[in-house]
Every structure is written in structure tokens, then in C-alpha cells.
Swiss-Prot record:
HAMAP family: THF_DHG_CYH
Name by which UniProt lists this protein: Bifunctional protein FolD 2
Any one GO biological process: methionine biosynthetic process
Keyword set includes Hydrolase: yes
Lineage: Bacteria, Bacillati, Actinomycetota, Actinomycetes, Mycobacteriales
Catalytic activities: (6R)-5,10-methylene-5,6,7,8-tetrahydrofolate + NADP(+) = (6R)-5,10-methenyltetrahydrofolate + NADPH; (6R)-5,10-methenyltetrahydrofolate + H2O = (6R)-10-formyltetrahydrofolate + H(+)
Family annotation (Gene3D superfamilies): Leucine Dehydrogenase, chain A, domain 1, NAD(P)-binding Rossmann-like Domain
Record pathway: One-carbon metabolism; tetrahydrofolate interconversion
Amino acid sequence: MTATILDGKATRDEIFEDLKVRVSALKDRGITPGLGTVLVGDDPGSAAYVRGKHNDCAKVGITSIRRDLPGDITQEKLDATIDELNANPDCTGYIVQLPLPKQLDENAALERIDPDKDADGLHPVNLGRLVLGKKAPLPCTPRGILHLLRRYEVPIEGAHVVVVGRGVTVGRPIGLLFTRRSENATVTLCHTRTRDLGAEVRRADIVIAAAGVPGLITADMVKPGAAVLDVGVSRTADGLRGDVAADVAEVAGFLSPNPGGVGPLTRAFLLTNVVERAERVAASLG
């Protein structure tokens, strides 16, 4: 068996085409969505991520709002920048790029973001709304995972989903999405200290690997025909590596590559969250 590849780049391009139409319709009503980014310091990886997000904005017609700050900035200066974006009517939604320099309090910065402008969908208020089943901006990577599975018609309802990883961006929130009544999956949350991880993963119809451990999920751990999504990213001497070993492709029914699988959809749904908020603003104006 050779796995069907879940092509995140092609799926992202489909989303971008849809967003172009929606942004054009908003502009016809006098509303131009704007994505803001707050980048502190000169970390090459963070700078590349931010640059990619603004390149995406240009493709769909969203205005870019950049706030690039020196690495030695104080918490007070960062807070003032966040407050400015909260109040800026041109900024529909924004993100604070992580990690921040050590002198800054990441949690305090993220909590200061206006929850309605939370483009990442990771503000504590919005995660709380997700727990309660209320409408809120959804976390981008979990949303991208769900969309990719649906795009390739991978059965979700009634599926047993095993998530490996307990981070706030993927591992913790994704179970909340999969167990909604619109998905009706059963979720097991595992991590690197799970006893007999292989036995847990082998029970899965869908495996989401998000632990940040290179090659953690191997072919002998995967049920034949299962869908495997590789979300983990680790920097190694050989470059960036995902959590899924290469031999999984011979066992899985569906496999998201890394890079090129879920990553492009994370960025696509960042823009989607911004456009959706702009549409809510337009609807409120009548």
C-alpha cells in the first residue's frame, strides 16, 4: 500500500481563491480586511514566518499591517503596540509572533490581544468559548487539519482519532474540534510519556502527530489504511524534520507530507479568520 498524499499546498490555493472573492465583495462594501503582525527581534525563523504571512495577504487582497520591534523592547512598549492594534480600525485581526525574547511575558502579551481580533484563535477567551461550544475564531492548525481530512473525504464521524502531543496550538484544542457534534469523532490524547504509545496509535483511524519529536511515529505503530497527519516540526542537523518516519507511507492510507501538508493550511486559516471577522463587521453595519 502506498498512501494517498494529503496535498496542503493545493488545498491552500483553493482556499485562497475563495478568499479572493470574499475580500473583493467586502471591498465593494467599503471594508478592506487587514492582518497585523507584531514581530519582536530579528530571529530568522520568526521573520520568515511573518514574511510568508504578508506574502499570503498580497495574494488575496488583505492589507498588511506590520509592527517590527527591537529585541530589547520593554514589556510596556510591547503592551503599547498591542493596545494600538486593538484600537486600530484598519486592523481586522493580528498575531504576536512567538517566541518572544526572554525579558517579555508571552502569556501577558497574548492575553492583552482583543479576543475579537485574535487571528490565531488561541486567546484564552476564545479557547474557553470553544470549550463551551460558542462561536469564536478557531485555532488555525486544528482547523486546517479538519479541512484537509474533509477535502480528501477521510471519514471523520465515528472515527477514533489519536493525537500525539499536548501543546496549546494543536494537541490540546484539536480534541475540542473533533468531538463537536459536527464531527462526532472519539479522541485519545497521548504524549511522549504515554505508556506503550505504539499500542495507542495502532488503534487509530486518524493519527495526528504533533509532539515535536523527529520520527516518533513509525510504520509498525500505524494501522494499515489509517490517515496520518504530520504536524510536528523539529530542527535537526539534517534540517527540519517531522514526527512521522518515512516508512509510514507504505502502511498509511492517507499521509500529509511535512513540509507541504498541514503547514500551508495553518496560514490559510489565519487569513480566513481575518476575513470572517471582516464579514461579521460588515453584517453588523447592515
